[in-house]
Amino acid sequence: FQHRHRRPAVTEVRRGALPETAWAEEAGLRYRLDFQRGQNLGFFADMAPGRAWLRERAEGKRVLNLFSFTCAFSVAALAGGAHSVVNIDLSRPALALGRENQNANGFADARVHYLPHNVFRSWKKLHALGRYDLIVADPPSAQKGSFLVERDYPKVLARLSKLLAPEAELLLCLNAPWLPADWLREQAAERLPGDRMSGFTLPLSLKLLSAQPVSVFPEL
């Protein structure tokens, strides 16, 4: 159980013990879970449709993964045959877990960059690495000192056009239930005029793997 009302959030084991190593499995790919991270385990199961969307389009593409966290989108892109991937996130531990995910899925030799940088201070660096055929933006809704969705997401959108290759596609994600359903669509339409937009819902599908059997929701 996670006590998210506490600061910092506390995870309480009600019965048994947490496995030292556990993996989520989705569409034949494996993603490392870290129960010591606090309230985020390193993998967001609700973004399965986004990863499937990216994987279907990734063959031969140059992919930019903004706010990459543990690089689950990167793994999906590589599984789809991406030419190269650039992951950028402030958290070095998250990127290290992302590299572990890449290696665990057999992509150790893939063309992947891991940039432990602030996105807002890295636009020139990202541009120097080339233009991108697919860009994923899945920022935190609120991260103290670095990102507030209402203030900062529009700034990200305004920068994307200079990074896009011809016929590029974007996957723009938002987890901010306090905002209107059309907020992101409206922001994108204003800053990326002329682009077609569509959306999809997020069903949940997750299998937990570990060295020992684990009851995700044991009887109490």
Question: Where do the language-model regions lie?
Answer:
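Conserved class I S-adenosyl-L-methionine
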Residues: 60-69
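Conserved SAM-binding loop of SAM-dependent methyltransferases across substrates and taxa
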Residues: 70-82
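A short glycine-rich, Lys/Arg-flanked "PGG" loop and its adjoining helix->strand segment in the class I
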Residues: 152-166
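Conserved SAM-binding motif I beta-strand of class I
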Residues: 84-89
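C-terminal catalytic and target-recognition region of SAM-dependent MTase-like enzymes
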Residues: 169-220
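Short strand-turn motif at the edge of the Rossmann-like AdoMet-binding core
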Residues: 139-140, 146, 173-177
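S-adenosyl-L-methionine
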Residues: 90-136
